[in-house]
């Protein structure tokens, strides 16, 4: 069984996906971490993130490995754990550029499709493009302000600046991030984490 949980940036996808995976006793897979890892490695190599061929060649020379765990994924490049650096502001600013490249999306999709089910897959287009035949699909959303307030609780940054960055990110991600026609859309704004997890588990159990 594959459960897909897509949604806009900072809508709670990672926390919800991890909670659902733990409740079901299956791994949780974060596609976004692969895009973030590609962005981090590109930045460290001083590559132009808009140059997809060079970036892809660099990634193939430094193969990435996603370690899917219910409590949170880790991404490795050889023996180096990239995970601690994946949520810095520079990566936030560049990841949409990387994710917009069809070649990079195809590369990430191939990594994900090689993983054996069952698992919970979290991302932007898991239910529409990567696993269109998944039997359980969900899409999380919330207003930019609510998402900014949540993110500011995790990082010492100004709420208004975070909100502006999220609105810009939403525009960049619009082509990739849309709910599948058969996905259940959940507004996480008025709900707590456990309530969202409970709604998804209830839907899966029906």
Curated annotation (Swiss-Prot):
Cited SUPFAM superfamilies: P-loop containing nucleoside triphosphate hydrolases
Compartments where located: Cytoplasm
Similarity comment: family membership: Belongs to the cytidylate kinase family. Type 1 subfamily.
Keywords for this protein: ATP-binding, Cytoplasm, Kinase, Nucleotide-binding, Transferase
Organism: Deinococcus radiodurans (strain ATCC 13939 / DSM 20539 / JCM 16871 / CCUG 27074 / LMG 4051 / NBRC 15346 / NCIMB 9279 / VKM B-1422 / R1)
Keyword Cytoplasm on entry: yes
Protein name (database record): Cytidylate kinase
Cytoplasm in keyword set: yes
Annotated binding of ATP, by residue: 7-15
InterPro entries in UniProt: Cytidylate_kin, Cytidylate_kinase_dom, P-loop_NTPase
């Amino acid at each position: 069984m594959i459960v897909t949980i897509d949604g806009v940036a900072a809508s709670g996808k990672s926390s919800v996906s991890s909670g659902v995976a733990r409740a079901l006793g299956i791994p949780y897979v974060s596609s976004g971490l692969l895009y973030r890892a590609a962005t981090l490695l590109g930045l460290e190599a001083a590559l132009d993130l808009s140059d997809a061929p060079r970036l892809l060649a660099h990634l193939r020379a430094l193969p990435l490995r996603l370690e899917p765990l219910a409590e949170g994924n880790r991404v490795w490049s050889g023996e180096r754990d990239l995970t601690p650096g994946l949520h810095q502001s520079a990566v936030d600013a560049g990841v949409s550029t990387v994710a917009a490249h069809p070649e990079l999306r195809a590369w990430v999709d191939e990594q994900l499709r090689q993983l054996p089910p069952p698992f919970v897959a979290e991302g932007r287009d898991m239910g529409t493009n990567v696993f269109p035949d998944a039997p359980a699909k969900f899409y999380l959303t919330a207003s930019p302000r609510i998402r900014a307030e949540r993110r500011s609780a995790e990082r010492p940054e100004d709420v208004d600046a975070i909100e502006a960055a999220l609105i810009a990110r939403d525009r960049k991600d619009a082509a990739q991030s849309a709910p599948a026609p058969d996905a259940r859309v959940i507004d996480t704004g008025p709900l707590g984490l456990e309530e969202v997890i409970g709604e998804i588990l209830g839907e899966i159990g029906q």
